[in-house]
UniProtKB/Swiss-Prot annotation:
Organism: Guillardia theta (Cryptophyte)
One Pfam family here: NmrA
EC number: 1.-.-.-
Keywords in alphabetical order: Chloroplast, Oxidoreductase, Photosynthesis, Photosystem II, Plastid
Subcellular location: Plastid, Chloroplast
One Gene Ontology cellular component: chloroplast
Protein name in the entry: Photosystem II assembly factor Ycf39
Disulfide bonds: none
MF (Gene Ontology): oxidoreductase activity
Amino acid sequence: MSLLVIGATGTLGRQIVRRALDEGYEVSCLVRNLRKAYFLKEWGAELLYGDLSLPETLPTNLTKITAIIDASTARPSDPYKAEKIDLEGKIALVEAAKVAGIKRFVFFSVLNAQNYRHLPLVNLKCRMEEYLQTSELEYTTFQLSGFFQGLISQYAIPILEKQTIWITGEYTKINYIDTNDIAKFAVRSLSLNGTIKRTIPLVGLKSWNSEEIIQLCERLSGQKANITKIPLQLLVFFKYLTGFFEWTTNISERLAFAEVLNARQDITSEMASTYSQFGFEPNDITSLESYMQDYFGRILRRLKELSDERERTL
């Protein structure tokens, strides 16, 4: 089977590429910056130029592709509204897949998306889910909650660098998952007929709130976090303020997620049936504790090595 990965240079996309290559798939990657994506070519993937914000750049000759995994999303820094990528670009991609005769399509959405449809970014995910459901494609939609990898910049690095961590004192717990594990499920789904035209929740082993994650990072790093709590109302104010300017629209839409954290409704799902369907066990899934332990272990070892090198040069 030959696979086309969209968003292949991103946090999730690159793990999907690596996993698919390891399992023997022929992998092509649709990228908008060939130079930045060169590492994917070194891994063994083929690079194709294309930009979802410019549908006319999508390749017209995709006949050798048998499946598409779309891990793309708009960035906060993009100079256009998220809809240009997360809806219009994806619809153009699906239409290109139909023309090429590609049936299999894997998409990533947000867990319990219908509950948060008032949020602009989630609404785009809902609309894309609905579009796929009315299409002729053999789609699989994975609904995700959050990535371990995003917690590094949010909590781990600020603690190590003694920077302030801003939290809202939220009540909601989120069941984060490692992108490596998401990649395992995504690639496995291509060989399971039972996943066709299905929406599947995909979460980790345990739900966490911000304070619990900070406590874990403090214990593993041996350092105390500098925490500042800010009222949720202040973030809501910034959301509306940034919404006034076109160049801050994406930032405003992401600030809207802060309102979810005070909803007192945990973002999680039961996974037993999913494990059974995919042939995985809970032991096959990485826990946040082991992920963070590995991260801090590597960083602290490196810091010790640098300290030893400085002492030897004195």
